[in-house]
A protein has these predicted regions:
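Bacterial N-terminal signal peptides that target proteins for export
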Residues: 1-9
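N-terminal signal peptide c-region/cleavage motif recognized by signal peptidases
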Residues: 20-22
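Protease-domain processing segments flanking chymotrypsin-fold serine proteases, especially trypsin-like
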Residues: 25-176
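Conserved catalytic-core segment of clan PA serine endopeptidases
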Residues: 138-154, 160-166, 171, 190, ...
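Cytochrome P450 catalytic-core helices
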Residues: 180, 184
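Short beta->alpha transition motifs characteristic of CBS
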Residues: 185-188, 335-344
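Chymotrypsin/trypsin-fold serine protease catalytic domain
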Residues: 241-316, 346-355, 360
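Catalytic nucleophile loop of clan PA
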Residues: 312-338
Length: 364
C-alpha cells in the first residue's frame, strides 16, 4: 500500500514498541456482545425508508483549511464543554469536569516526543480477509454485510436526523457504545449551515434493506443529543476550523445495547500502525444496506487529535466508528470516528484521552 503523503498538524506521534491492552472502567469503554434477544417488540421510532438523503462528509481541501490545535488553556478547556439538545427542545450546557479540565491542561503542556512503532492491531476476523489500503478513488474494496443480526453488526446502525429549516432528512452511520449511548459525528447532529441543531434523531440498528421490515430490531428515538462545545464555538466559516471537535453522542430513550451489544472504545497513547475497520451505510450502495471496509493506518498519519487512512467511504459513512481488533483484549476497540474526506485521504477524529473522558461523562 502506498503511504499517505498528507502533512499532518505539527504534533507528537506517540507510539512504543508494545501495544498496551486498554484499561477500562467498570462500564464506560468496555465492549459487550449483548444477550442476543430481539428488540423489535420494544421499538419506539417510526422509520420510513427512503426519506433521508445521505449527509455528505465535510471536505478538507488543503492543509491551510485545517486549524491548528488551541494552545490557550481557558479556550481549550471551554471547547470540551458539553452542549446538547433534548428531545423536547431544551438546551443543555455542562461545564467540563475537573478531571477533564486537568487532563486537557496536562495534555496541552505535554512535551512533544515519541517514536514510530510496528504493527499493533489485526484485521477484525469477522470482517474476513481482504486487500486493504486502496484509495477511495481507486478500486472499491468494500463488502456488504449480509447478516446484520449478529454482533458486532447488531451494534452498528443507520442514523436519521431532520433539518428544522427545510424539513428534509439526512442520514449518517453510528455505533452503540453502551446500553443507551450512540457514538457518531457532530456534523450529523448539528448544522453549521443552518446554525442550528438537527432534530428527530432516529437510530436503526442492523438495518439491512430498503423497507421497514428490513430493520430487524426496530428503530429507536432519542432522549438527548450532544456535541463538544468547540464544534460550535470555534467555527470560523470552514470545516477545518472544527475538525478536531467533530464528535457527537446520542442518548436513546431505551436500553438497546443490553440486547444487541456495543463496541468498546479507548485511548491508546501508543497508537501506531494498525488495521482500521469501518462499517456503515454509504449512500452509493443500495438503500439501507450495511458495508464494511478495512485498511492500514500508518503511524506517520496519526496525530494526537486525528488520523488519516485510505478506507473507502461515501456520503452516509459519516459517523462510522473506526475500530481496531485487539488480539490481546479480544475486543473491537473504537479508536476514532470517520468525519471528513479530502482528495488524498479520509479522516477520523481520534479518541484521545480527553475525548474518551468527554464520552465517559455522557455514558449511559
Amino acid at each position: 500500500m502506498t503511504k499517505l503523503t498528507n502533512a499532518l498538524i505539527a504534533s507528537a506521534l506517540l507510539s512504543t514498541a508494545m501495544w498496551a491492552v486498554p484499561v477500562f472502567a467498570a462500564d464506560p469503554g468496555s465492549a459487550s456482545a449483548g444477550n442476543g434477544e430481539s428488540m423489535r417488540d420494544a421499538t419506539s421510532g417510526d422509520y420510513k425508508p427512503g426519506r433521508a438523503k445521505p449527509i455528505a462528509p465535510p471536505q478538507l481541501t488543503d492543509e491551510d483549511n485545517r486549524a491548528a490545535p488551541i494552545t490557550d488553556e481557558a479556550a481549550a478547556v471551554k471547547s470540551y464543554g458539553i452542549v446538547g439538545r433534548s428531545a423536547d427542545g431544551k438546551e443543555i450546557k455542562i461545564e467540563p469536569s475537573e478531571a477533564l479540565r486537568d487532563l486537557i491542561i496536562k495534555e496541552l503542556n505535554a512535551p512533544a516526543n515519541g517514536t514510530e512503532g510496528g504493527p499493533r492491531k489485526t484485521e477484525d476476523p469477522d470482517l474476513g480477509e481482504g486487500e486493504a489500503g486502496r484509495q477511495v478513488f481507486g478500486t472499491d474494496d468494500r463488502e456488504q454485510v449480509k447478516n446484520t443480526k449478529t454482533y458486532p453488526f447488531s451494534a452498528i446502525g443507520y442514523l436519521e436526523a431532520k433539518s428544522p429549516k427545510t424539513g428534509s432528512f439526512g442520514s449518517c452511520s453510528a455505533t452503540l457504545i453502551g446500553p443507551r449511548t450512540v457514538l457518531t459525528a457532530a456534523h450529523c447532529l448539528y448544522s453549521h449551515e443552518d446554525k442550528d441543531w438537527l432534530s428527530d434523531y432516529l437510530f436503526v440498528p442492523g438495518l439491512n434493506g430498503s423497507t421497514a421490515d428490513d430493520a430487524p430490531f426496530g428503530a429507536f428515538t432519542f432522549e438527548s443529543a450532544y456535541v463538544l462545545q468547540g464544534f460550535i464555538d470555534n467555527y470560523q466559516g470552514y470545516y477545518g476550523s472544527v475538525l478536531l471537535w467533530d464528535l457527537g453522542i446520542v442518548t436513546l430513550k431505551q436500553d438497546v445495547g443490553t440486547n444487541l451489544g456495543w463496541l468498546g472504545y479507548a485511548n491508546y497513547d501508543d497508537l501506531g500502525d494498525f488495521i482500521a475497520n469501518l462499517v456503515g451505510y454509504p449512500g452509493d450502495k443500495p438503500m439501507g444496506t450495511m458495508w464494511k471496509a478495512s485498511c492500514e493506518v500508518h503511524a506517520e498519519n496519526i496525530a494526537p487529535e486525528y488520523f488519516q487512512y485510505d478506507c473507502d467511504t461515501f456520503p452516509g459513512s459519516s459517523g462510522s466508528s473506526v475500530y481496531a481488533y485487539d488480539n490481546k483484549a479480544k475486543q473491537r476497540i473504537i479508536t476514532g470516528v470517520n468525519v471528513a474526506e479530502s482528495p488524498d485521504a479520509n479522516t477520523a477524529v481520534r479518541l484521545n484521552a480527553a475525548n474518551v473522558q468527554w464520552i465517559n461523562s455522557l455514558y449511559k
